[in-house]
A protein has these predicted regions:
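Terminal and domain-boundary accessory regions
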Residues: 1-217
């Protein structure tokens, strides 16, 4: 059996992409702790980072705290609101920059998203001799992103591991994602789940300085 314990892995989670995929397709919530555990396997965790937005109300803070308790770092950016009423809070550029900066300390990059904007990143990661692992719900994933991946994990093949069912939820396939939503409906479920123990990440001395903002709870 192949020993994978030496492989250094970074898991980068596009929270909103996962949240809306699970809600719109399955009417369910995401088990973020299991996403990290299942994509990591027997490999060595260096960093597990969730990227999301913060709002003026602060209602999402309990959700961030739940992720912290699972051993997942949380990076946030403020929701941008324009005079036109348009709101923007996507993280694709920020995630890409972080991965490029951390690449020297990783053997495997796990991008948890179905967004086709990560295809150029995947090509770069592979050209640098690293493994590009994509994990997502196939129904909401770009075919080009799947083709680009060295390894692809389809959460839809093992829904009990990656979803938290809620009888009050119903699939809403025609609902458009909005950066203003703040995840209050997933907070209680994440907090009530059994504590997920993630492998200890590498010591801070082995890691580059973190860019951007991290939530302080």
């Amino acid at each position: 059996m192949l020993d994978l314990s030496h492989r250094r892995v970074g898991v980068f989670i596009d929270v909103q992409n996962m949240y809306y995929s699970a809600r719109n397709i399955y009417g369910s919530k995401v088990n973020f702790g299991n996403i990290v555990l299942k994509t990591l396997g027997d490999q060595r965790l260096v960093r597990a980072i969730a990227y999301t937005v913060s709002t003026k109300t602060g209602e999402e803070l309990p959700f961030f705290e739940a992720l912290h308790k699972m051993g997942i770092e949380v990076n946030t950016k403020e929701l941008l609101e324009y005079d036109s009423g348009h709101k923007k809070g996507d993280w694709d550029v920020g995630i890409t920059v972080d991965i490029i900066r951390m690449l020297d300390m990783l053997d495997v990059v796990v991008i948890v998203s179905g967004d086709g904007d990560y295809v150029p990143l995947g090509e770069y990661v592979k050209n640098r001799g690293r493994i590009f692992h994509v994990a997502s719900f196939r129904e909401s994933t770009s075919s080009k992103l799947v083709e680009c991946a060295d390894v692809y994990t389809n959460f839809s093949d093992d829904l009990p591991s990656f979803l938290i069912n809620d009888p009050k939820y119903r699939p809403t396939p025609n609902t458009k994602s909005s950066a203003v939503d703040t995840f209050d409906d997933v907070i209680a479920e994440q907090q009530q789940k059994e504590h997920v123990e993630l492998p200890k990440p590498a010591p801070k001395s082995d890691q580059p300085r973190r860019r951007g903002r991290k939530t302080n709870l």
